[in-house]
């Protein structure tokens, strides 16, 4: 399922993925929204149909507004294609 959400007051095109263990944010969206990035203590290996990549960066405590409800999300920074955000089960 896809949709439009707000992340730290910026509009984001999101994919809702119940099979994802983490939530992700695109490097491009991080730059556009000026999100604060922290280094992870260890890299996270992300597997997809296109192969595997690792990430050492996270945007912690992002405000995500979905259906008028505000949630806090930790978003792992990766290169994404068509989406700004992938919201997983975390």
Language-model region placement:
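Aspartic protease
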Residues: 1-90
